[in-house]
UniProtKB/Swiss-Prot annotation:
One annotated GO molecular function: proton-transporting ATP synthase activity, rotational mechanism
Family annotation (PANTHER family): ATP SYNTHASE SUBUNIT A, CHLOROPLASTIC (PTHR42823:SF3)
Annotated protein name in UniProt: ATP synthase subunit a
Homology family: Belongs to the ATPase A chain family.
Transmembrane segments: 25-45, 82-102, 104-124, 142-162, 181-201, 202-222
GO BP term, example: proton motive force-driven plasma membrane ATP synthesis
Assembly: F-type ATPases have 2 components, CF(1) - the catalytic core - and CF(0) - the membrane proton channel. CF(1) has five subunits: alpha(3), beta(3), gamma(1), delta(1), epsilon(1). CF(0) has three main subunits: a(1), b(2) and c(9-12). The alpha and beta chains form an alternating ring which encloses part of the gamma chain. CF(1) is attached to CF(0) by a central stalk formed by the gamma and epsilon chains, while a peripheral stalk is formed by the delta and b chains.
Membrane topology summary: Multi-pass membrane protein
Keyword Cell inner membrane: yes
InterPro entries the UniProt entry points to: ATP_syn_F0_a_bact/chloroplast, ATP_synth_F0_asu, ATP_synth_F0_asu_AS, F0_ATP_A_sf
Length: 229
């Protein structure tokens, strides 16, 4: 699903030699745009830091502080090392969701490749952290408490862990792509005031989906840090 007109059209020409689909090229182009915007915003917010923050610095400190508090409350103080990853994913997903509300812009999270990439990052981090924390004993997370049921539980747990990737991918993709479809239908029927309620709803959906993804990422990583039974 793409908007009737798009920003950064020249990226399509740039990506043509890679034989990427139109939707994929749009997602890549807008992902680069969001990364550039976040980098510029970070540099502006950290330029000339003051003890008493104001303006952009204060705004960014509120956001970062809120995410950090949520990480500590959910994962405990041993979850602080994962704060940069969680915050990066949350802010990237939120901005990606919100940018689709600007006419002519495409949200990267409405492309399944973007959401799958974010989900795979969480999946890999979860198991790398688990192996690093527990070593070979990490396999206990997959065996269950009853020894004679261990083979069956291992199979079930492996499927369950892979289903997390599918769940994270499809939940975010489905909500954002569905919202894009509905918004485009409303714009096609009545391009002025009628789509406004859906755009306001889109703001709420954008925040909720970013929060849900962040919360599940913290829960999965926290689970890998716990002792297996």
């Amino acid at each position: 699903m793409v908007h009737p007109y798009l920003f950064l059209q020249f990226f399509r020409k740039l990506l043509e030699p890679l034989h990427i689909s139109e939707a994929g090229a749009d997602a890549i182009a807008y992902t680069w745009l969001i990364i550039a915007l976040l980098l510029i915003l970070s540099m502006l917010a950290t330029k000339g830091l003051k003890t008493v923050p104001g303006g952009l610095q204060n705004f960014m400190e509120v956001i970062i502080g809120g995410v950090e508090n949520m990480v500590v409350e959910t994962m405990g103080h041993h979850g602080k090392p994962f704060f940069p990853l969680i915050a990066t994913l949350a802010i990237f997903i939120l901005v990606s969701n919100l940018i689709g509300l600007v006419p002519g812009f495409f949200p990267p999270t409405a492309n399944i490749n973007t959401t799958a990439a974010c989900a795979v990052i969480v999946f890999v981090t979860t198991h790398v952290v688990g192996i690093k924390e527990h070593g070979f004993k990490y396999i206990k997370h997959f065996l269950g408490p009853i020894l004679w049921l261990a083979p069956m539980m291992f199979f079930i747990e492996v499927i369950g862990h892979f289903s997390r990737v599918i769940s994270l991918t499809l939940r975010l993709f489905g909500n954002m792509n569905g919202h894009e479809l509905v918004l485009m239908i409303f714009f096609g029927l009545a391009p002025f005031l009628v789509p406004l309620p859906m755009m306001l709803m889109g703001v709420l959906v954008s925040f909720i989906q970013a929060f849900v993804f962040m919360l599940l990422a913290m829960i999965y990583i926290q689970g890998s840090l716990e002792e297996g039974h």
